[in-house]
Structures are given as structure tokens and as C-alpha cells.
Amino acid sequence: MKLEGIHPVSSKEHMLNPTDIFVVAAHEDKGGQKMVEKAANKSHVTPERMLYSMMIHLYSDKKLVRIRAGNTLFTIAAFEGRVGYVHSYNGDTVPNYIENMHQFLESARKIGFDTLVARIHTPELVRILKAAARKMKDPAVKTHFDSEHNLFAVSTGKKRD
């Protein structure tokens, strides 16, 4: 795939395979590319290629819960107290990403997660997460963004025992 041909694809029109989702996610994640730039230079690869390899490696961890919604892949590392740490890999358009995130939040709730936490490095992603959380009709769903640590937390509903 040529660099100029890499772009988000509407899942309503075409479902990407997971490899293509990682290609698009690595290409679109400029903040992630910046974070891996030094390591990529030492390894003599582009930051985009380094980020792609890291995404594949992280997604392959058998201990993680994996969920797909549209052209977005999610992983959840489960912790005590029904808490999960989330990574998302998006290859979808923004309107679909919001819907995919909403489906993901609903699915995570159904499989037992009360709180989800993610590290966020763009204000746009905070807006997308808040929009997805608003789509959940449960008044117990709450969001919180800690800008000092770039952590976003969302409760998926009322706490369960």
C-alpha cells in the first residue's frame, strides 16, 4: 500500500482486515509516531513502521480481551475491581469511530467491566470518547479526563459487586 493511499475507510462501505486497520491506525496516529521517533531512528525504521510493529505486538498478547467494532480493534487488559485498561486501533472514519466506541463500551459492560481507562494524547480523542459515552443511555455512565496524566476514564454504568 502506498503512503498516499492510506486513509480511514468507512466500515459501512468496506470492512478492512486487521492488518489494514493497523496500517491505517499507525499512519493516522501522529502523536504515537512522535512518541516512538527516537526508538525508530535507532532501529533505522520510520516512526510509522515502528508504531505499526508495536501495535501488532501489543494486540497479539493472549492475556488481553479483544473486541472489534467496525474498522476499529480494541484490547482490554483486565484488572481487579472490574477495571480495564484499553487500547484502540482505528481504521474507520470519525462518525463510525464514535459508533464503534459506543458499541465497544456496551460490549465491555456486558462482559463485566465497570470502569475503563485509556491513555489519550489528542483532544480530538477526548471529544470522541465523550460523544460515545453520551450515546449510552444509562445515567450512571460518567467520564473523567485527567489532563495532567492524559488518562481518560469512563464508568460503563452502575458499579457492580
Language model regions located:
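Conserved catalytic-core motifs of GNAT/GCN5-like acyltransferases
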Residues: 135-153
